[in-house]
Amino acid sequence: MPTKTVVENDVEIIMPKLYKVMLLNDDYTTFDFVIEILKTVFHKNEEEAINITLKVDREGSAAVGVYPYEIAQVKIEKTHTLARQAGYPLRAVMEEV
């Protein structure tokens, strides 16, 4: 999924495509759980996690981070697994940047 090739000192570097991970709002997942996901899965600090959670609640979705495809996919899967285990319908999606 490379998007850009750069040649430096006769070494070809292929830059991966990047994907924005978004959290989607629902009527059941608690603020505390979303904040915990943001801190543990996405490594956000408390203030960042609260701000993102409020944006998800107000606007219906919010960007959490930008990652190469494989990393974005793993973070989404981890979010869905933890949400299911806790009994919440929290969803995350990705879109190409």
Curated annotation (Swiss-Prot):
It comes from the Bacteria. One of its GO terms (biological process) is protein catabolic process. Transmembrane segments: none annotated. Pfam families: ClpS. SUPFAM superfamilies: ClpS-like. Involved in the modulation of the specificity of the ClpAP-mediated ATP-dependent protein degradation. Binds to the N-terminal domain of the chaperone ClpA. HAMAP family: ClpS (MF_00302). Belongs to the ClpS family. This is ATP-dependent Clp protease adapter protein ClpS. The gene is clpS.
